[in-house]
Amino acid sequence: MNIATTPVAPDQAPFRIGLGEVTGAVADLGVMVPLATALILVNGLDAGAVLVCAGLLVVATGLVFRVPFPVQPLKALTVVAVAQQLSPGVIHAAGLEIAAVLLLLSIRHVADVVARVFTKPVVRALQLGVGVLLVVTSIKLVLNPPEIFSGTPAAPWPWILMIVAFVGMVVAARTRHYWVALGVLALGAAATATSASPHVGGPSFSLPDLQIPAAGAFASAFFLLVVPQLPLTFGNAVVAVNDLAHEYLGAAAARVSPSRVCLSAGIGNTVSGLLGGMPMCHGAGGLTAHIRLGARSAGMNMLLGASLLLLGLFFTAQVVVILGMLPVWGLAAFLAYAGLRHAWLVSDLRGVDLVLAVVAGALGAWFANLAITAGLALLVVHGRRVISPRAGNLEA
């Protein structure tokens, strides 16, 4: 089975907007909406700042890379921050520290050199782990929907609707009739709005304020949030997303490199950390979600980024209500489909490399910590090369 899509021709319009860009834009919201909402509701981040900073980075990456490119919350960091109910200052300090590391890696192509350590089995192990976690997240969304999804029907309807929506995703992706996926989501949103009857209210313009974290926040941020996040960020949101961009998009992704991805995420997190947004990355799972649901140009970024900016600038007070109108079972279906396709990328490995990737990816997914995946895969791959140089030469 060919895991890659047909590469995008480099002479195609990089900013066109079609139905595939629309469905691709919403394909990764199953990750962004719950995580961003948790940071807003539990940790007290400003909703407008979160969406404005995310929208700016989404638009900027589209303009820079000229292909559909993902922007996601930093997952490991968000999970720890929410679980420990850390203050906005600590979260913003962590974003600035991660930005500093990524900017250092972008200097003189340091990231391109470091990326060579992440060989194909290591990257595939991370992709498998991310894919499994996406599927698990989709199941948890339906099993225990966040409170913002107020119009969710009683069981077993969410499971039935998720399965129907998942089949719709498969049909849409295989036939390239992306209106099927968009129609499923639109009908679900309409049904949710009808049953919940949310009060949205009118628009009001607001801009994020400059927020400088206190000096004492940086030490806590580094040990609690940055240390567990960095291996996953570099492995999945730098090396793996670069690998997938070239695999999925061919010559159209010529502007994408590990150093440029580090620079993009570094600048984005600097702005976000100073304006009160959330820490973000370019997760490889998000790229699979966008591509598999139809996005083929940076028009997807323009569409998604403009939508986030519109919400963040004019509907700050209503953000949670508006996002809660999306059908949780529809988002879960998008997430499950993207996760399965992302995990399936491991299928092009053979022999010992396949076993390594599956074991490392499965362990990371089991413990919900992909730093374990990265560490184990790196240790085994490069340990084999030290013990048996011949094995390393054959792999290379």
Predicted regions and their residues:
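Transmembrane helix-boundary motif of multi-pass solute transporters/channels
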Residues: T23-Q85
